[in-house]
Design a protein with these regions (language model features):
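Pyridoxal 5′-phosphate
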Residues: 1-388
Length: 388
């Protein structure tokens, strides 16, 4: 049976060029980048070159890039180290109700330590109201962390306007750009972003590597203690093959390639919607009504059929999709994103699926998915009708 992967918001297959780069580095540049001998210098050159590529991708300075194990670590670092450094200036932190759990769980911890965390609501498009942010900002606000693109429904926050508002206050602005990086053009200077988190495995790079951009005016205390790597900001011997692979994945994403991907994903999304409508499937797009979305994610409420049934039957039919964030899907928890948008009693919470396109997705894949989903929905609704 052929298996079709439509869960690219969870992770992506590693690009062949990235694999080639990494295997070459594993064989040739195995030295410790902190060593002063030839092998160390060789590894350090790869590290510097890769860091420059990553920095250029968001219009940042090379020294502003802290290499991490991925966006989870980057988010924790930005939030917890800001709280540690600025606790004497204020205890208010602002975020949203639909952030990734690597933001929400540090927030819960900080609340237990006496911090005042404000969770901004979102509208039915999964976007905050700027007026709510403006009202929540106080002189005691030390950090605002709002994701750039949502991993479950694909909503895209008004980052430029948020940056402007935050910088009228005393707060720092952090954004989790994990889902947007690689699809959208990001400029940390233009958007007045102080800190930004990224993971390589969302852009056809390796897992367990990412970065945290930190504006050079901000000096966070070290997150991991030990050696003096990353200019004393994050201890631990750098993973040179992974860093080089990350940089290669970024190099592949030229502006023209990103534009082509956006156009392809928009076409796939339209194909799904038109096909399911033609097949008589009763569904709605979660977050519908917004023209500003991270284009590879499509979250749908399939009326009358549970998420579990849809996901299980699609898996049996050979399709990899998701009921929400891969980081919580194994727990079968209801989507906190859909609850924030529609309320915990909405049938959408228990009857929605997420599909997410990637560079290897084809029109034939989408056609096959629509046929399989149609068959599954019709079969289950007929079974329900027979029991009535």
């Amino acid at each position: 049976m052929e298996h079709i992967y439509l869960d690219n918001a969870a992770t992506t297959p590693i690009a062949p060029e990235v694999i080639e780069t990494m295997t070459t580095q594993m064989a040739q540049d195995f030295g410790n980048a902190s060593s002063t001998h030839f092998f160390g210098r060789q590894a350090h050159t790869v590290l510097d070159t890769s860091r420059h590529i990553l920095a250029q991708s968001i219009n940042a300075k090379d020294n502003d890039i802290i290499l991490t194990s991925g966006a989870t670590e980057s988010n924790n670092m930005a939030i917890l180290q800001t709280a540690q450094k600025r606790a004497n200036e204020g205890k208010r932190i602002i975020t949203t109700a639909i952030e990734h759990h690597s933001v929400l769980k540090p927030m819960a911890y900080l609340e237990s330590q006496g911090f005042d965390v404000v969770y901004l609501p979102v509208n039915a498009q999964g976007v905050i109201e700027l007026a709510d942010l403006k009202a929540a900002l106080t002189p005691e606000t030390i950090l605002v962390t709002i994701m750039m693109g949502n991993n479950e429904i694909g909503s895209h926050m008004p980052i430029h306007e948020i940056g402007q508002l935050v910088h009228e206050s005393n707060a720092w602005f952090h954004t989790d750009a994990t889902q947007a990086y690689g699809l959208l053009d990001i400029d940390v200077q233009e958007d007045q972003i102080d800190m930004l988190s990224v993971s390589a495995h969302k852009i056809n790079g390796p897992k367990q590597i990412g970065f945290l951009y930190v504006n050079d005016a901000i000096h966070l205390p070290s997150f991991l203690m030990g050696g003096e790597q990353e200019k004393k900001r994050r201890a631990g011997t750098e993973n040179i093959p992974a860093v080089a692979g990350f940089a290669k994945a970024v190099e592949l994403l030229t502006p023209a390639v990103k534009a082509e991907h956006r156009a392809r994903y928009a076409g796939f999304k339209q194909q799904v919607l038109e096909t399911l409508q033609a097949n008589g499937i009763n569904f709605e797009v979660n977050g519908a009504g917004s023209d500003d979305m991270v284009g590879h994610v499509l979250n749908m409420w399939v009326k009358g059929v549970s998420t579990y049934v849809l996901q299980m039957n699609l898996d049996l039919a050979g399709f990899a999709i998701s009921g929400g964030s891969a980081c919580t899907a194994g727990d079968l928890e209801p989507s906190h994103v859909l609850i924030a948008m529609y309320g915990e009693n909405s049938p959408r919470v228990a009857e929605s699926i997420r599909i997410s396109f990637g560079v290897e997705t084809t029109e034939a894949d989408v056609t096959a998915f629509c046929a399989a989903l149609t068959k599954i929905v019709q079969k289950n609704l007929a079974k329900q009708a027979g029991k009535a």
